UniProtKB/Swiss-Prot annotation:
PANTHER family per record: 60S RIBOSOMAL PROTEIN L23A
Name of the coding gene: rplW
Single GO MF annotation: structural constituent of ribosome
Protein name (Swiss-Prot/TrEMBL): Large ribosomal subunit protein uL23
Domain of life from the UniProt record: Bacteria
UniProt keyword terms in alphabetical order: Ribonucleoprotein, Ribosomal protein, RNA-binding, rRNA-binding
Similarity-based family: Belongs to the universal ribosomal protein uL23 family.
Function, in words: One of the early assembly proteins it binds 23S rRNA. One of the proteins that surrounds the polypeptide exit tunnel on the outside of the ribosome. Forms the main docking site for trigger factor binding to the ribosome.
Short name of any one Pfam family annotated for the protein: Ribosomal_L23
Organism: Cereibacter sphaeroides (strain ATCC 17023 / DSM 158 / JCM 6121 / CCUG 31486 / LMG 2827 / NBRC 12203 / NCIMB 8253 / ATH 2.4.1.)
């Protein structure tokens, strides 16, 4: 499957945290994705961009925090993460090039 331009709109960037690193040991990868992205779209985009087979996709929406800026309350943007589990034998190394 070849990657289309809309696939790059779905996947924003890889998430590199302690929890994401533990997920990679269980053959998984974590990506920040577009808020309107669905699980089938995320699966299709990962398979097309990285040439791997996806076993499952789980998503999490993190609500933006309320913070004060110059004494006035503001709200940070909501974020969506996708925990992508890969089939056995497939790997994605997101730490390359850091």
């Amino acid at each position: 499957m070849t990657a289309k331009p809309e696939h790059y709109d779905v996947i924003r960037k890889p998430v590199i945290t302690e929890k994401a690193t533990m997920t990679s040991e269980a053959n998984g990868v974590v990506f920040a994705v577009a808020m309107e992205a669905t699980k089938p779209q995320i699966k299709e985009a990962v398979e097309a961009i990285f040439n791997v087979k996806v076993k499952a996709v789980n998503t999490v929406v993190t609500k933006g925090k309320t913070k004060k800026f110059k004494g006035r309350p503001g709200v940070r943007s909501d974020r969506k993460k996708a925990y992508v589990t890969l089939e056995e034998g497939n790997t994605i190394d997101v730490s390359t090039g850091l």
